[in-house]
């Protein structure tokens, strides 16, 4: 035991003294937005190894793995105490088999295991944070077989965010195991301006709440519905791309909104090239929820290799139109109805022109024709004809355009 302890401490010391100025994240990860599941939205602190194993099982049997989801992420409250040498331990009551055994189980399913920590002394739920233990924790995670680290921002009043996140990035890289690094700084310090070389994604807002258009006051902080989070993405699309994504938070599909709201929520997250991290109970979700979360054509828009975040193309108040360039000259177009009533909408393509200064795409619809397919109901048509659609209240119509 003593020999193993000295070896472990020696490895940590070696990591600390060998940090290079060119330290980097693992560049081969998140070339498209990551897809997975996270425990927080539904379970909060009520997590244990039995439930996590069941979620891994459900991700496979529900068809979510086949649809592209791969990460099973444990959020806050898995932590026990640090041992006398500062190494973090899993809560032995709720994770009696240990994290290595849990990771082995998840890996045997063809999935990956994610874990949570915090840049401060304590996590948001008061468990041990990683401040001052970054290299120890990264080495521990690597030894457990962890594949994903979500790094939160509680208890950080006197910490520089860029430095704090860079330190954990360096620690993960030095630990030697590729781990996706998810920055959860809530957008308070504009991580999009400095985090491209630090993490694979960064949160752009505070926490999500399962509502269409609300701000939920928790006292000292607020959480936000679908539309407020969408609106906070204005001006951020230029920062997104393969390996570095604007993260709009875990999804609330299946957690109490209407079917149309869930479909719109999922479609918008896909268009904005946000990570698609489910936040519902995978074990008992409805067929409708499963159909939304595994919708092949929507996921294809999110996972398009160009990695271009959609732009708001046209704004007519309650009716907004988003467009996203895709591979092979294709485009995805989303009509969003923010209002409480359904809307009949007439759209003459020939009157419209699209120019995207960021991705350098442009379309003259009076000169270039596309065939379109409504990805949610299968209807087809052409941009040579006037489009007449009914956009549901709190809903979307999504078309995929392909060159004629």
Curated annotation (Swiss-Prot):
Catalytic activity of the protein: Hydrolysis of terminal, non-reducing alpha-D-galactose residues in alpha-D-galactosides, including galactose oligosaccharides, galactomannans and galactolipids
Family annotation (InterPro entries): Aldolase_TIM (IPR013785), Glyco_hydro_27 (IPR002241), Glyco_hydro_27/36_CS (IPR000111), Glyco_hydro_b (IPR013780), Glycoside_hydrolase_SF (IPR017853), Melibiase_C (IPR041233)
Temperature dependence per UniProt: Optimum temperature is 50 degrees Celsius. Displays half maximal activity in 25 minutes and 7 minutes when pre-incubated at 50 degrees Celsius and 55 degrees Celsius, respectively.
EC number: 3.2.1.22
EC category: hydrolase
Active-site residues, Swiss-Prot/TrEMBL: 152, 207
BP-aspect Gene Ontology terms: galactomannan catabolic process
The protein's name: Alpha-galactosidase A
Source organism per UniProt: Cellvibrio japonicus (strain Ueda107) (Pseudomonas fluorescens subsp. cellulosa)
Lineage per the UniProt record: Bacteria, Pseudomonadati, Pseudomonadota, Gammaproteobacteria, Cellvibrionales
Chain's gene name: agaA
């Amino acid at each position: 035991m003593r020999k193993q302890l000295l070896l472990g401490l020696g490895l940590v010391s070696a990591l600390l003294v060998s940090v290079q100025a060119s330290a980097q994240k693992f560049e081969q990860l998140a070339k498209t937005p990551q897809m997975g599941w996270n425990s927080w939205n539904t379970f909060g602190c009520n997590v244990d190894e039995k439930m996590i194993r069941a979620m891994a099982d459900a991700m496979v049997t529900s068809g979510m793995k086949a649809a592209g989801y791969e990460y099973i992420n444990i959020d806050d409250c898995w932590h026990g105490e640090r041992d006398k040498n500062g190494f973090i331990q899993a809560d032995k009551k709720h994770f009696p088999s240990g994290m290595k055994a849990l990771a082995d189980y998840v890996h045997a399913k063809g999935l990956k295991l994610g874990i949570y920590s915090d840049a401060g002394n304590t996590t948001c739920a008061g468990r041990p944070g990683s401040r001052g233990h970054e290299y120890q924790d990264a080495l521990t995670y690597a030894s457990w077989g962890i594949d994903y680290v979500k790094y939160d921002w509680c208890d950080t009043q006197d910490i520089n965010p860029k430095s704090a996140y860079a330190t954990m990035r360096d620690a993960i890289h030095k630990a030697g195991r590729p781990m996706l690094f998810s920055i959860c700084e809530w957008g308070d310090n504009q991580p999009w301006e400095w985090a491209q070389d630090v993490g694979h994604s960064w949160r752009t807002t505070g926490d999500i709440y399962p509502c269409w258009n609300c701000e939920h006051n928790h006292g000292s902080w607020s959480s936000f519905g679908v539309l407020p989070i969408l609106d906070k993405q204005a001006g951020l699309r230029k920062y997104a791309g393969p390996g570095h994504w604007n993260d709009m938070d875990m999804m609330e599909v299946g957690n109490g909104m209407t079917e149309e709201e869930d479909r719109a929520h999922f479609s918008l997250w896909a268009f904005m090239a946000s990570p698609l991290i489910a936040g519902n109970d995978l074990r008992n979700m409805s067929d409708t929820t499963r159909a939304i979360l595994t919708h092949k054509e929507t996921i294809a828009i999110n996972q398009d290799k160009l990695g271009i975040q959609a732009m708001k193309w046209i704004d007519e108040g309650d009716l907004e139109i988003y467009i996203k360039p895709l591979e092979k000259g294709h485009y995805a177009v989303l009509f969003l109805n923010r209002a409480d009533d359904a809307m009949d909408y007439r759209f003459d393509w020939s009157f419209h022109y699209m120019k995207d200064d960021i991705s350098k795409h442009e379309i003259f619809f009076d000169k270039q024709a596309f065939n379109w397919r409504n990805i949610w109901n299968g209807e087809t048509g052409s941009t040579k004809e006037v489009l007449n659609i009914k956009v549901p209240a709190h809903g979307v119509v999504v078309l995929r355009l392909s060159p004629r």
